[in-house]
Swiss-Prot record:
This is Uncharacterized 44.3 kDa protein. The lineage of its organism: Viruses, Viruses incertae sedis, Naldaviricetes, Lefavirales, Baculoviridae. It holds the Pfam family AcMNPV_Ac109. It comes from Orgyia pseudotsugata multicapsid polyhedrosis virus (OpMNPV). InterPro entries: AcMNPV_Orf109 (IPR007748).
Length: 390
């Protein structure tokens, strides 16, 4: 997939709002700056949130919803040389470019933009939001209170009151209409209309999460969608995050956890008799990260977790317990480090571990873990059983 050189993509978490200061008149024929500006936005509601008066260098400003052009070609887009063209958070392929450089400002690095000339703008030290759930909560009636206001497209004058057990409903398709609430209030019910396309849901969630990052205190939220759909949206956001990493971005400090992973952690808390609350989950992960990464040790509780659903006669070792290091090619197994996607077991004749299987050496490692780590007792260290010549 190709992308025309004239398209310049800038990706930043700050682009939940339109970056007026980054829009400049491009030169047309004869090196004269164009006086016409065309701005393409992702949704009908976003048309209202591009203020034409903020473009004093242009005589004519037109703002349109970016529609799918099935007759166009993103590899050879149509040229409109009489205007400067700008895209804000596009969700469909770009099939029209303007004079000079066509700039794209987006919070998401989508598949359509991945092969373009891309600049990543880093955002340091975000404040990460916290998702929570209400068991058995029927959220749809609360969200329908917002849908009735859709006839009035400009929602900036409408501030929905706090309702239903302290939850504040937010129309996710109009994040900028709720900007003040999202930055100053707490306990949000993020509402989507049933007919909202998946790509719009992904963009809306990303824009809201970007707004949350600029808060002084972490925001707490719940989404009025089935858990399976929320997990799917999170996965797609993680794919966009991976594309940004491939383009030179820095890893994010904010993580999303799907329900299966969360249940895995909760099962571990049960085995260790740890109280179940949000803070102990964070503490649990922090403790075991200090064992896994510096010392390349898989805690026995992870082995037990992987054996909970084992078939009769199957041992924990047969479950292929592995811990994958983020952005690394090495996996940590119950028998030591192996390259990712390599077998867990090797013939005994391929590796002599007597150098490591020494009581004095193992005791020294155990003492180092006890002193430098977070556990003072109960740590048992085994020698590696094979080697892949790492």
């Amino acid at each position: 997939m190709e992308c025309p050189f004239q398209i310049k993509v800038c990706v930043s978490d700050r682009f939940f709002a339109f970056p007026y200061n980054l829009v400049e008149p491009q030169t047309a024929v004869g090196n004269r700056p164009t006086e016409n500006l065309v701005v393409y936005v992702p949704t009908d509601a976003d048309v209202l949130y591009v203020e034409k008066r903020n473009f004093p260098r242009f005589r004519s400003v037109l703002v349109y919803k970016h529609e799918q052009d099935y007759n166009g070609n993103s590899q050879s887009p149509k040229k409109t040389g009489a205007a400067t063209i700008v895209y804000w958070n596009p969700l469909v392929p770009i099939t029209e470019i303007g004079a000079g450089e066509t700039r794209v400002f987006s919070v998401l690095l989508t598949n359509n933009l991945f092969y373009c000339n891309t600049l990543i703008v880093h955002h340091e030290n975000p404040t990460c939001p916290i998702e929570f759930t209400y068991p058995g909560l029927e959220m749809q009636p609360v969200c329908k209170l917002l849908s009735g206001a859709r006839k009035s497209v400009d929602m900036r004058a409408h501030a929905p009151p706090l309702s239903y057990s302290e939850l504040r409903p937010i129309n996710c398709e109009l994040p900028l209409a709720h900007f003040k609430e999202l930055t100053e209030s707490d306990k949000f019910l993020l509402c989507f209309n049933l007919e909202t396309p998946t790509m719009v849901k992904i963009l809306c969630l990303k824009r809201i999460f970007c707004i949350f990052q600029y808060r002084k205190l972490p925001a707490r939220y719940v989404i009025n969608l089935p858990h399976e759909e929320v997990d799917s949206l999170y996965n797609k956001l993680n794919w966009a995050r991976t594309r940004r990493l491939l383009r030179g971005d820095i890893p994010s400090n904010c993580a999303t956890v799907n329900r299966a992973s969360l249940q895995y952690v909760k099962d571990a808390q049960t085995l260790l008799h740890i109280a179940k609350c949000s803070q102990t989950i964070v503490e649990f992960v922090r403790i075991f990260q200090q064992l896994i990464f510096p010392y390349q040790i898989v805690p026995i509780v992870i082995v037990k977790l992987n054996s909970l659903n084992a078939k009769s006669g199957q041992t924990a070792h047969e479950n292929r317990v592995r811990v994958f290091c983020k952005n690394d090619s090495v996996a940590i197994t119950t028998a030591g480090c192996v390259p990712v996607n390599m077998p867990d077991a090797a013939p005994a004749s391929t590796f002599d571990n007597t150098e490591f299987d020494d009581v004095a050496h193992l005791k020294q490692v155990a003492n180092r873990v006890a002193v430098d780590g977070v556990f003072t007792s109960g740590v048992v260290v085994h020698a590696v059983r094979y080697n892949y010549f790492l």
